[in-house]
A protein has these predicted regions:
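Hydrophobic/aromatic-rich alpha-helical bundle segments in the mid-to-C-terminal region
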Residues: 125-130, 147-202
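Short, basic, alpha-helical segments at the C-terminal edge of helix-turn-helix-like DNA-binding modules
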Residues: 69-75
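An amphipathic alpha-helix signature
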Residues: 22, 65, 97, 134-145, ...
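Amphipathic alpha-helical packing segments from all-alpha helical-bundle domains
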Residues: 76-77, 81, 104-113, 123-149, ...
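Helix-turn-helix
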Residues: 20, 24, 28-62, 66
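Hydrophobic alpha-helical connector segments
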Residues: 62, 66, 77-109, 160-164
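N-terminal intrinsically disordered/low-complexity leader segments
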Residues: 1-16, 177, 202
Length: 202
């Protein structure tokens, strides 16, 4: 079997431009929302010409369709960065909340919610979005289970994981609506206390 040749400089530049456009699309989604995100805003953020954008993505819809998988790439990178920052004595609850937050909160979380809502009436894109987010969520659950190990009962860990995912997504929506940040922090703190009890061994 012949090994794949490394990309040449032209290919590398093309891949960089593509990534810049997709990153800019996610940033614009987080800042402006799907309805207000324009091609001109995306190209300006990416620092590329409209011609370069058309070369990679002919339409706005095509660009956002590819942004779905790119979002997962960035979520996975954020997850792995957080894993690398975990201290050896990090508690199971802090592992759980920290990893879920790294994956589903912040700017990436906002971009994901915008994509969810914008694809509500497009069956194909909605299916793609649901599939990709399900895959990263299952990967996240597996990672949490591996890191936490047998320090918490498996059934409780899975239940606490899914509740944490829903809570973090909910606080992200709350942030997008401009609600009270102190209240969001209090909600997460309250959940940290409850989750600690849920994961405690008998």
């Amino acid at each position: 079997v012949t090994a794949a040749l490394p990309p040449n400089k032209h290919q590398e530049k093309s891949l960089r431009t593509r990534a810049l456009l997709l990153d800019a699309a996610l940033d614009s989604l987080a800042d402006r929302g799907y309805g207000n995100t324009s091609i001109s805003d995306i190209t300006a953020r990416a620092g590329v010409t409209r011609g370069a954008q058309v070369h990679h993505f002919h339409t706005r819809t095509e660009l956002f369709a590819h942004a779905i998988d790119h979002l997962v790439v960035r979520q996975r990178e954020s997850l792995h960065r957080h894993i690398g920052q975990l201290a050896p004595d990090t508690t199971p609850v802090e592992v759980l909340i920290g990893l879920v937050t790294a994956t589903f909160a912040g700017r990436l979380g906002k971009a994901a919610i915008e994509l969810y809502s914008s694809f509500a009436t497009d069956d194909e894109l909605r299916h793609t979005m649901l599939r990709s987010q399900h895959e990263i969520t299952i990967e996240l659950l597996s990672t949490c289970t591996e890191l936490i190990g047998d320090t918490a009962p498996r059934d409780r860990l899975e239940s606490t994981f899914w509740l944490t995912v829903n809570l973090i997504r909910g606080t992200t929506v709350d942030e997008m609506l401009g609600r009270d940040e102190r209240r969001r922090r209090q909600v997460v703190d309250d959940w940290r206390t409850l989750a600690t009890l849920a994961l405690a061994t008998d």
